[in-house]
């Protein structure tokens, strides 16, 4: 989080101006601190823009064996649509073939959540995430499947609460059937 009070004043004023433009009464008790809360929420949802990626810890292979794919399904994450700054609820499944060492499970999940914490276009994000995982996991192969429910088409525009968008990317030699549950329940 950004802790400089002076730095936060400008975006908070911007939120106040937006609320006034929309016709909101800024003196209502429930709205008094909304600009501060909104800025704090945006900081949290975009922390991947400011924080360094989490360090990945590797465990050595204790015997000489060729490992098959490791699959982690349905990692929950939240991004923002870069066009509307509305949330995208994500379920991300990844598979990787370890290279020189096995990355810790929690570190892989943290890396995926960090990567998602920014404004994205899902198609481009999926490709970038595959490249990031290939590099950070020192993998021989990576496969990524991203299932997203975009609030920009869920609550506005076409207002379709039943859709989800699925994107996939593959790097190296890997072919796994990945699944991911719809972030707002299964159909």
Swiss-Prot record:
GO terms assigned for molecular function: GTP binding; GTP cyclohydrolase I activity; zinc ion binding
Pathway assigned to this chain's UniProt record: Cofactor biosynthesis; 7,8-dihydroneopterin triphosphate biosynthesis; 7,8-dihydroneopterin triphosphate from GTP: step 1/1
Underlying gene: folE
Enzyme class: hydrolase
Domain of life assignment: Archaea
Name assigned to this protein: GTP cyclohydrolase 1
The keyword GTP-binding is annotated on this UniProt entry: yes
Taxonomic source organism: Pyrobaculum aerophilum (strain ATCC 51768 / DSM 7523 / JCM 9630 / CIP 104966 / NBRC 100827 / IM2)
Entry's family note: Belongs to the GTP cyclohydrolase I family.
Entry-linked InterPro entries: GTP-CH-I_C/QueF, GTP-CH-I_N, GTP_CycHdrlase_I, GTP_CycHdrlase_I_dom
Enzyme Commission identifier(s): 3.5.4.16
Keyword RNA-binding: no
Transmembrane domains' residue ranges: none
Residues bound to Zn(2+): 81, 84, 152
């Amino acid at each position: 989080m950004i802790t400089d009070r002076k730095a936060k004043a400008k975006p908070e004023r911007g939120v106040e101006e937006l609320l006034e433009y929309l016709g909101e009464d800024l003196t209502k008790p429930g709205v008094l601190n909304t600009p501060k809360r909104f800025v704090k929420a945006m900081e949290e949802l975009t922390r991947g823009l400011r924080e360094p990626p989490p360090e990945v810890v590797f465990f050595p292979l204790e015997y000489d064996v060729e490992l098959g794919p490791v699959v982690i399904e349905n990692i929950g994450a939240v991004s923002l649509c870069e066009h509307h700054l509305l949330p995208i609820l994500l379920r991300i499944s990844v598979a990787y073939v370890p290279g020189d060492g096995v990355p810790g499970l929690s570190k892989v999940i943290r890396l995926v959540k960090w990567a998602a914490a920014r404004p994205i276009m899902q198609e481009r994000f999926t490709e970038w995430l595959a490249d990031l995982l290939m590099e950070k996991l020192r993998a021989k192969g990576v496969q990524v499947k991203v299932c997203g429910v975009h609030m920009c088409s869920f609550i506005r525009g076409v207002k379709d609460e039943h859709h989800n968008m699925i994107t996939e990317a593959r790097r190296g030699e890997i072919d796994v059937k990945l699944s991911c549950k719809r972030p707002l329940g299964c159909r």
